[in-house]
C-alpha cells in the first residue's frame, strides 16, 4: 500500500505556523477525500508519540501507510499534492521566520529537544526498525538522525519553562 508523512516538530512554536500547516494539509487531503485529513491527522498523533515521555513528537500533520482505497493514478496525484503542499507550507514558514533571532538558551533547548527525534527513531519508528532488522546499510538508515543532539539530567528553570510551553502546544489536538 501507499504511505507518506507530513509533520512538523518545532522547538519554538508559533501558533500561526501550526494552524497554516494543518490548514494546508487539510486542503490537500480534501481534494481526494473529505475524511482523509481527520483520519490521517489522528494517525500522525498516534504514531509519532513517545510513550516513555508521555508526549507527541511535534505538532502533527498527516500520516498514512498501506493506503489502498484510491486507484493508482489518484494515489500518485495525492502523493504529489502532499509533497507540493509540504514544500510550499514549509517554505512559507522558513520565509516568515528566517530573520528570527534565537538565544543561546533556545539553541540549547533545540539540541535537547532533538533528542526526542532520535529517541523516537531508534525506539519506535517502524521504518528504522525494518532497516536495522533487514541488515540494511546502517549509515543510510541512521542518516536521518540529527548530527547534534543533547540530553541533560538537570534542567534549568528556563528550560523547564520552555518545555512546559512547548508540551502544551505539542500535546494539543491541532486538527482544523
Protein language model features and the residues they cover:
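Intrinsic-disorder-associated interaction segments
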Residues: 72, 131-134, 159
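Long, contiguous hydrophobic alpha-helical segments, chiefly transmembrane helices and signal peptides
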Residues: 62, 117-120, 138-145
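Long, contiguous internal "core" modules enriched in hydrophobic/ aromatic residues
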Residues: 7-100
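Short, small-residue-biased leader/transition segments that mark boundaries at the very start
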Residues: 1-6
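Extended, compositionally biased non-globular segments
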Residues: 73-129, 165-176
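Amphipathic alpha-helical/coiled-coil segments positioned at domain termini
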Residues: 125-144
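Alpha-helix initiation/capping motif
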Residues: 14, 33, 132, 146-149
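TerminUS-proximal long segments
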Residues: 138-176
Amino acid at each position: 500500500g501507499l504511505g507518506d508523512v507530513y509533520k512538523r516538530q518545532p522547538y519554538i512554536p508559533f501558533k500561526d505556523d501550526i494552524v497554516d500547516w494543518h490548514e494546508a494539509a487539510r486542503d490537500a487531503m480534501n481534494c481526494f477525500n473529505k475524511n482523509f485529513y481527520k483520519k490521517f491527522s489522528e494517525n500522525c498523533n498516534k504514531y509519532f508519540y513517545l510513550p516513555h515521555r508521555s508526549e507527541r513528537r511535534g505538532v502533527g500533520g498527516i500520516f498514512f501507510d498501506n493506503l489502498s482505497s484510491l486507484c493508482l493514478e489518484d494515489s500518485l496525484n495525492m502523493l504529489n499534492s502532499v509533497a507540493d503542499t509540504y514544500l510550499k507550507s514549509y517554505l512559507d514558514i522558513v520565509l516568515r521566520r528566517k530573520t528570527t533571532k534565537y538565544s543561546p538558551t533556545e539553541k540549547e533547548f533545540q539540541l535537547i529537544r532533538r533528542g526526542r527525534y532520535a529517541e523516537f527513531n531508534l525506539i519506535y519508528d517502524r521504518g528504522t526498525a525494518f532497516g536495522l532488522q533487514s541488515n540494511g546499510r546502517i549509515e543510510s538508515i541512521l542518516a536521518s538522525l540529527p548530527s547534534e543532539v543533547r540530553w541533560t539530567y538537570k534542567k534549568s528553570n528556563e528550560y523547564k519553562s520552555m518545555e512546559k510551553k512547548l508540551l502544551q502546544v505539542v500535546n494539543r489536538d491541532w486538527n482544523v
